[in-house]
Swiss-Prot record:
Role, per record: Substrate-recognition component of an SCF (SKP1-CUL1-F-box protein)-type E3 ubiquitin ligase complex. Promotes KAT7 ubiquitination and subsequent degradation in collaboration with MAP2K1 kinase, leading to reduced histone H3K14 acetylation and increased cell proliferation.
F-box domain location: 1-45
Name of this chain's protein: F-box/WD repeat-containing protein 15
Pathway(s) where this gene product acts: Protein modification; protein ubiquitination
């Protein structure tokens, strides 16, 4: 017998379901199908998974409903999971194009139902030029004129297909990677140390940290200076933004400097905030930071302390509280655990959206919950793990042989599933190492450096079409 409920209570019940359960509910009868296919429900799921989902996103993707957008985007994300090693083509960029110092994806998306879109990587080389490389065709698609000063920092904003560079003279340039000349230019008086370009709810911005401990916020696309704030007594090591860019953590790896988490809007809305709003996380000698994917307010830090040394993992929830006209930020420690370095010495880590910490030692890949319960171990001896790349979908383990293992986070469990291994086609140089690894939906890149500081960029391009 079919169950009949008024629309509002039924919609309330359906709003608690995940996508898989909504699809099942839609099969009950015609009325349930109509409610379970509601744009309100599917837009909520899209916003939870991909954050900035609005009507512009829907029009850009050419979809009629949020349900169709969700299903197609999931299909796109899982292209690498469905693939096998034989479905990838190994490519290497010619060394005649120059020696590479940086490589960042500038393409916004990969696969579509209609076929295979381009993966495009933006690079800086030793000739002080910026260029873009079509990963699938292995060709240079754009190149800037040679710059008057060496470029020391590069970042990209794939959503807008732009790149931002900073040279040794602290000149900032914004590029659309189509025109030969930069779209906008600005300068700082002090040397730059860190660079980030992000989308916020107030619009796209560039964040730059200098050696004096200042953070400078510039507007995109004209590089107008929005604000400059001194946040630390020394230059900070990195700029770590939360998934929706509500928060930004700034810190320096120093025993007497504690990490600070700032409310991003307090940097951007200078007329509304007389000073930045922040909180201090009371742990020193942090080594790495990772914001929990698809959760705006949770961050995990790995630090070291004591003798014999231990590695600490601490997870905080960051909250904004209002008292009248005053707003304050609080960081609440919700979980922690430690590992003895003489037994397990993690070097790198990441976090899944289900609060699972994955970390790598030289010889193993380990999974813990945020309280320290070990969930799984993947052994790598006699190989050595040299890089670990973690995002909401993938975990990529890179070994000293140049081979890489691709894992996928399970949708309905806490564990990882190993998908396949990709091999490099030529041996690494005797003293070569993998400087950087990154991926998008349809490709994986590696920046390899040898003993002479010569670099090459290799890629694995997925050649599966719909």
């Amino acid at each position: 017998m079919a169950i009949h409920l008024p629309c509002l209570p039924m919609m309330k019940i359906l709003s608690y379901l995940d996508a898989y359960s909504l699809l099942q509910a839609a099969q009950v009868n015609k009325d349930w199908n109509e409610l379970a296919s509601s744009d309100v429900l599917w837009r909520k799921l899209c916003q939870k998974r991909w954050l900035y989902c609005d009507m512009d996103t829907l029009q850009l993707q050419g979809k009629e409903t949020w349900k169709q957008f969700f299903i197609d985007r999931i299909w796109q994300e899982r292209a690498k999971f469905r693939a096998k090693a034989k479905d990838f083509t190994y490519k290497e960029i010619p060394l005649m194009c120059g020696l590479f110092g940086y490589a960042c994806y500038i393409s916004g998306c990969g696969l579509t139902r209609k076929g295979q879109d381009k993966s495009v990587v933006c690079m800086v080389n030793s000739k002080n030029t910026i260029s873009t490389w079509d990963v699938h065709k292995s060709v240079i698609t754009w190149k800037s004129p040679e710059q008057p000063a060496s470029i020391k920092l590069l970042t990209t904003l794939p959503e807008m297909h732009i790149a931002v560079t900073v040279d040794i003279q602290s000149t900032i340039k914004l590029w659309d990677c189509h025109n030969r000349e930069a779209l906008a230019t600005n300068n700082l008086k002090s040397p730059c140390k860190s660079l980030k370009a992000v989308f916020t709810k107030d619009g796209p911005i560039v964040l730059i940290g200098d050696t004096l401990g200042n953070i400078h916020i510039f507007r995109i696309p004209d590089l107008y200076l929005i604000s400059t704030v001194n946040v630390l007594p020394y230059g900070f090591d990195g700029i770590y933004c939360s998934p929706q860019k509500k928060w930004v953590l700034l810190s320096k790896k120093h025993p007497h400097i504690l990490p600070k988490v700032f409310y991003m809007s307090s940097f951007l809305r200078t007329s509304e905030f007389s000073a930045p709003v922040s909180t201090v996380l009371k742990l020193s000698l942090y080594e790495r930071v990772f914001w929990t994917p698809r959760r705006e307010d949770r961050i995990t830090l790995m630090s070291r302390s004591g003798f014999p040394q231990v590695k600490m993992f601490e997870t905080y929830d960051i909250k904004l509280e209002e008292f009248g006209n005053k707003r304050i930020v609080k960081g609440k420690l919700i979980a922690s655990f430690e590992l003895q370095c003489h037994k397990v010495n993690p070097q790198r880590f990441g976090v899944s959206d289900k609060n699972v910490i994955v970390c790598s030692t030289e010889s193993s890949l380990l999974l813990f919950d945020i309280n320290g319960l070990r969930l799984k171990t993947f052994q790598y001896c006699p190989e050595m793990i040299v890089k670990l790349s973690v995002d909401p979908l993938h975990v990529i383990v890179i070994c000293n042989t140049g081979s890489m293992d691709v894992y996928a986070w399970e949708e309905r469990s806490l564990l990882l599933r190993k998908c396949y291994r990709l091999h490099i086609e030529r041996p690494l140089p005797l003293y070569g190492f993998i400087y950087k690894a990154a991926c998008d939906d349809v490709s994986i890149i590696q920046l390899i450096t040898d003993e002479l500081s010569l670099s090459s960029l290799t890629s694995y391009a997925l050649n599966i079409c719909s």
